[in-house]
Amino acid sequence: PAFEKDSCGVGFVMNMKGEKSHEIITQGLEILKKLEHRGACGSDSATGDGAGILIQIPHLFFQKNCTGIKLPEPGRYAVGNIFLPVGEDTKQGQEIMERAVVTEGLELLGWRDVPVDNTTIGKTARSVEPVVKQLFVGAGPDIPDQLAFERRLYCVRKRSAWGIRRAGLNDNNESFYTCSLSSKTLIYKGQLMAPQLETYYLDLKDPNMVSAL
């Protein structure tokens, strides 16, 4: 135990009955803020070394906010939070992700722009701020269960990362990154201080954003 040391702070909150609510997310964000002392910053005191939150996929929230995307029942679609390069490379990054989805025999359902407010983040973080989009992927009729679906999604992540490297989009920075891609959970994260997460990602304030953990 004396050697079990790490610089990261991790907190957990859940509803023991599996009942989803926005309160769980609010409590999770409060835990995150109380762990701010486990993070770090450099000369730019408003740029952190990273903070994030993992929640269950909020089906009702996406039904209300994903206009133009027809979502299957929960468990039969996945959501990915994707960091993409800014400018002309944004579209190319999306196309590489889309090809990986199709190659793995999955259904491309669409994209959603993730609303953010960068007014409180530091200059350093803002200088490397990516485009944040959500990718929606359907399981398709030939995927027998959620476990098989998750395996295909893992392959999508690996194929897209390889495609990005091959295209040279990450030669000068790490602006392409898959935060998460799953039919079960969703991760909101960034180069942020702990208290900045809930102000940066506007989704986290929506009462329809619910989770049991």
Place the predicted regions along the sequence by residue.
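N-terminal segments that mediate ammonia production and transfer
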Residues: 1-213
